[in-house]
Amino acid sequence: MAEQAVSEPSVYAVEEYSVQEEPYYLPIADEIELFETAYEQRIPVLLKGPTGAGKTRFVEYMAYRLGRPMMKVSSQTGEEAEHRMPLITVACHEDLTASDLVGRYLLDTDGTKWVDGPLTRAVKVGAICYLDEVVEARKDTTVLI
């Protein structure tokens, strides 16, 4: 069986990843301005704190706040679609592999097909990718990040 790479469509259904309602978040200091500046400069952000400190809620709030409409164009059909800022959350654990994040080849009836992982999907659509509890991931997976 010959191996062939079949790429995913260039437009993903990202509506399921959009934060539709404004989450309640009470700023403590200048974290909103710092996050916005990092986002504008394309600098990754690491949030560190104990369980229940509000890291996940803050990322959800920022995804909503940065939720200006984004245009995506499908190279296959030329159709345009408008979406809010997607937020893709990955719950990290000790069994999480690099392939789980990036993607992998899978067999189907037509041969081999590449399926993007959440990190690759986030990069392709300009989403925020939140790796929850990244310290729980395997060392070989964190090297990828």
Regions found by a protein language model. Give the residues of each.
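AAA+ P-loop NTPase catalytic core and its hallmark functional loops
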Residues: 1-145
